[in-house]
Amino acid sequence: SRIPSVDISRRFDYLYNYQHHCTEQLTSKALPLLFVSQFKAVDEEEAQKIKTNVQEAIRQLYARQIPNGGFVYWPGNASADEWITSYAGMFLILAQEKGYAVNSNVLNKWKRFQRAAAQNWRMPDQDDSWGYWQTGVQQAYRLYTLALAGAPEQGAMNRMKEQAGLSIQAKWRLAATYALTGKMKPAEELVYNAETTVSPY
């Protein structure tokens, strides 16, 4: 069957002109630009536009990292947002893989923050169902970003794997983390007979 047209060029034009700039939005604007050439032909002019936009996002993210290595949601915030820290760090790692210069000190501070957060993580009481779901997904994503950065936190991964009541999303993300590190057996154990459909939330 034919795949409907999604007008890729128009979608990327929207990203170039996106004007909202919390750290999540800043990262969401730049992240897809790393992969434009996989979806459409890119001439020299557009390649330069992509490069400029990605480099500017990297520069702005540097200014949103606080001394402990985490990233804030808005400039001027005093404390790191754990989800945003994982997301921004993932973008920086992928940008580096695509050949962009990323400050090693920024990445090292980020890794330290991620490792400490991963090691200190504990699942909350199940009475708080939303918090229970959210923190599990957050930890699995954090572990995934560390593995992506070549710094897997194996002990925290193994502890989480044994945690009862993990959500579908957390299981699949943790399985992807194991797969990234080449450990297919625990990855397969996590998702054996696991659901592939996520309920609305």
Describe the function of each predicted region.
Residues 1-133, 139-140, 144-147, 154-158, ...:
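Extended, solvent-exposed functional surface patches
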Residues 63, 150-151, 182-186, 198-201:
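Proline-centered turn/helix-capping motifs that create local helix->coil transitions or kinks
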Residues 154-157, 184-190:
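Solenoid-repeat scaffolds in large eukaryotic assemblies
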Residues 158-168, 192-201:
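Solenoid-like repeat scaffolds
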